[in-house]
Amino acid sequence: MISTRCPHVAMATLMLFVGACSSTTSGKGSGGTGSGGSAGAGGKATGGASGSGGLSNSGGQSSGGSTTSSGGAGAAGGVTGQGGQGAKAGQSGSGGLSAAGGTSGKDAGPSAGAGGSGAGGSSGVEVDGGPHQAAYYVSPTGSDDNPGTVSAPFQTITKARDVVRTINSNMTGDIYVYLRGGDYRITSPITFAVQDSGTSNHRIYYQAYPGETPVINGATKVTGWTASTGGVYKAALDRKTKLRNLYVNDARATMTSKVVSSKGGTGTYPVTSGQAAWAWAGGSGADGVKYSTSDVPDITSNKDDLEIVNQTTWNENIVCVRDVVATSDGNRGLMLQQPYGAIAQLPDSGAAFSVSGSHEIFNVFAWLTSPGHFYFDKTTGTLYYYPRTGEDMSTADVEAPVAETLIDIAVTSNTGRVKNLTFQGITFANTDYNLYKVDSSYGKSSVQGATIYIAYGAGKSIHDWKYEILDTLPAAINVNSADSIDFVGNVVKHSGNEGISMINDVINSNIIGNFITDIAGSGMTIGHPQHVYLGDGGAHEKFAKGVEGICTKITINNNLVYNVATLRGFGSHAGVTAFFTDTLTFTHNHVHTVAYNGINLGWGWRNFPDSTTCKNNTCNNNRFTNMMTRLHDSGAVYTLGQMPGTVINENYVKGIPNNSSGPTYGLHNDEGSAYITENDSVLDIDKGVTYTINCEDYGAKHDLTILRTYATVNKMGAKPPNSTIDTPMVVTDAVWPLAQYGFCVKSGVEDAWSSIVPSSLLPVQDYVFPASCEAPTGTSSVPIRSSGNAANAVWFAPTGTTSFVAGGTMTKAAGDATSIAAPTTAGTYKLFVVDSQGKPLGESASLLRVK
């Protein structure tokens, strides 16, 4: 179904020229020609051609740091154009090509197929990207023996990268690698090192061929399904290790599971300090967990594939099983893989794996009784799957992931960063993660957030260890030691770990206009918990002096992060995690449906008041929807530790649950939060929350400025020292005054990038009119968002209206208008988008009240 806000790709002007050739002309192009993009009924055409991914940067040069790109998306940072010279973040090239290709955006939505589009191969014409040094083409149907022209493309991205290495030492213009549509299946990451950098202030682009969708796919396709028993199907899968993730018809399937009550621990696993590299201290933990034999069957094969997950108020942990035994008291004993089973019992503050309480056990074949679940028998190499309603296993696209990471950008010294790369219009899909390995054991445990315990350190807290006992997880895209790396207009989906991670010493880089969805952990992770100090040289420090660096000047703008922290065991991962960061700019993003909080900003609690590595961050004009779907004790925006110069302004929050299962807050300034300005928040939250904003005098919070909060409830604690905090203005029915409604309209993904938002997630009328508001009679201008098509009409009219005539109870604006007059008659109205044929496309959930 075609979205009402995203057209078919309007191919930008293409010109024939000799591909893979060197250009004698370098520098900035002169503006180029960007296609306006024709839009069908209900479609969207803005700026340059708004391709499937909605990219439209078609203008000329934009100076570094510019917040607009001429003719394009207007994304913060002046994101790279398609042609000409794009020397660094903030500098737009000037060629005319403006179709991103590849980002499925709203047309396809979260259920879009994984496969790429376009024929690839030898058809097509070469792309006129403006002045450049060279252009190469890659297609899944090409050959690495080819010269890399449009008629004879390479087959692999690594081949193109290696050829680029031979010509990029002293670049005279940008280099383009165009990826034709289709699946680029890999089993290990495509790596980029210093020798892969853009040089002489020029960039190297890896981007979609116009109108096509290249998919860097970390999975193998499973075929040959036959009926088994009880509605289950089976197929052969050549794999020797546990399968934790499976994707069927572009949707995640899950391992079989059952929630059971523990009978406590069994046995003891002792640890002696220094017995191995992971034994930082001595102690002991339970060696196994007991369950009733009526709850857990006798399991005789693939015992080491069993997993146990527990949930605390704000955390989840995973331990793995090595054996299943009968205990002396007549119970079933699941003996843990060690030493990770003991490590998982360490985290403090009630966040650890506990051998008592409620557990969810995964990977028992007998429990394969529900649609959308799978079981892999690695002993026989057989994959079993229970189809969802409507799935035909003879045609189903079943993807069994192999690769844990798809793109790995890294070097080992901050004197030799990877520089000046752009990845644009690409779909990154289908990764696995087999948990953290310590000796021969696996698991995933932490005290909080997108971190993982890596050693046994009993007797000390994470603060005592200066977080050296914590690490981050791998991601589908890993970036370290890099400068000016941009991800623009991509789709990142179906990850078994994190989405995009920029962990150590990444500077001047951008993540803009991406759709990030179905991620096991955080959609994006920036920084590292060990960056509380730089160069302090702890005994277990991950990053050596000269390698360690704060992530600085990272811009995250106009992204949709949807349905992340999806897997059990990953619940404490925020939609976006930022540890110690300097000048992080997080603006105009929409974070939707997260197990815990929308963004985790900061680290360190109150324990390191002299740390100066987290500062000058901005979190403005974002939208947070449907937070804390599993865990509690947080809010849409969560801050931790001091961060001088940080502003968190004009954010719109809709959907914080009540505290019946644990404490909940609209916003949460946790321990040590200080030197933060947090103004003009609009909080549409359940009246049963614990606090409107948890900024009370606890945990050494201080120097907070929180002004002009509007919320559906007023529940505030005692004010911390040196703080200025207004009492929230209460609007119980969430029908906001026009000024506050204006913040709602400005929040989230902007019009230039609206094509990344699936209509199935946010129908056009709710995109145009995102919140309820109240206006006095005679109001001539109520702000709205553009429907994206001037041929549409936008109406305020009474609910249920099917025939539209302007008058006292109905007002009209063009489909691309950004404001509309309120009806002159007092009453309650809805917003309708009507197509050029007069057909209403939908009635808004929000209302306008005219008084």
Tell where the protein language model's regions lie, with residue ranges.
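Short proline/glycine-enriched turn/loop motifs at strand-loop junctions of beta-rich domains
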Residues: 786-792
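Ser/Thr-rich, Pro/Gly/Ala-heavy low-complexity intrinsically disordered linkers and tails
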Residues: 16-134
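Short glycine/acidic-rich loop motifs that flank beta-strands on beta-rich extracellular proteins
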Residues: 188-189, 404, 432-438, 474, ...
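Extracellular recognition modules
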Residues: 830-834
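Extracellular polysaccharide-degrading/modifying enzymes targeting complex plant/algal/animal polysaccharides
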Residues: 135-481, 486, 533-538, 542-545
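Right-handed parallel beta-helix
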Residues: 419-430, 463, 483-497, 506-521, ...
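Extracellular beta-rich repeat passengers
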Residues: 260, 434, 659-762
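Short, solvent-exposed loop/linker segments at the N-terminal edge
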Residues: 772-778
